[in-house]
Structure formats: C-alpha cells, structure tokens
Amino acid sequence: MKLTCMMIVAVLFLTAWTFVTAVPHSSNVLENLYLKARHEMENQEASKLNMRDDDCEPPGNFCGFPKIGGPCCSGWCFFACA
C-alpha cells in the first residue's frame, strides 16, 4: 500500500514538473512549422524535399567510416556505399 502511494505521488510530481518546465510559447512553434509547411506547398521551388543531391556517391564507391546518412545516395555507408 505504501509503495502504491509513493508511486502515485511520484507520478503526480513528475507530471506537475513537466507542466512547470514546459516551454510557455510552444503553440507558436507549432504554428510556425505549419506556416512553413504551407509555404512550401504553395511554392514548391522553396521546398527542400524536391531538391536532389547529385553529389552523392553511387553504390560500391568508398565512403569512409560506417555511418547512416553520409555521402552515399542510398544513405548507408559501410566503408563502401550500399
């Protein structure tokens, strides 16, 4: 019973702490993201999604240290592009 009460108090404390430390203007952040997305829909030349990266390495070329992302067109690098 004591453990249950302690867990309830801990959850309530953490919930209150989350609300106290939350960003006060977080709704403006979401609004700005919405406006940016809307602008990119209206002006497709401004969209980063339509840009193609022609500087990437084709499969089989050396890319360096194993990583995700990197210079490979596929995004997978394990010493050679996948």
Swiss-Prot record:
Primary site of residence: secreted
Signal peptide extent: 1-22
A molecular function (GO) term: ion channel inhibitor activity
Post-translational modification: Mostly non-hydroxylated.
InterPro entries: Conotoxin, Conotoxin_omega-typ_CS
Pfam families found in the cross-reference section: Conotoxin (PF02950)
Propeptide intervals in chain numbering: 23-52
Source species, domain of life: Eukaryota
Keywords recorded for this protein, A-Z: Bromination, Calcium channel impairing toxin, Disulfide bond, Ion channel impairing toxin, Knottin, Secreted, Signal, Toxin
Tissues where this protein is expressed: Expressed by the venom duct.
Compartment(s): Secreted
GO cellular component annotations of the record: extracellular region
Positions where 6'-bromotryptophan occurs in the chain: 76
Disulfide bonding pattern of the chain: 56-73, 63-77, 72-81
Domain topic, free-text comment: The cysteine framework is VI/VII (C-C-CC-C-C). The presence of a 'disulfide through disulfide knot' structurally defines this protein as a knottin.
Family: Belongs to the conotoxin O1 family.
Function as written in the Swiss-Prot or TrEMBL entry: Omega-conotoxins act at presynaptic membranes, they bind and block voltage-gated calcium channels (Cav).
Protein name, per record: Omega-conotoxin-like Am6.2
Species assigned in the record: Conus amadis (Amadis cone)
Source lineage: Eukaryota, Metazoa, Spiralia, Lophotrochozoa, Mollusca
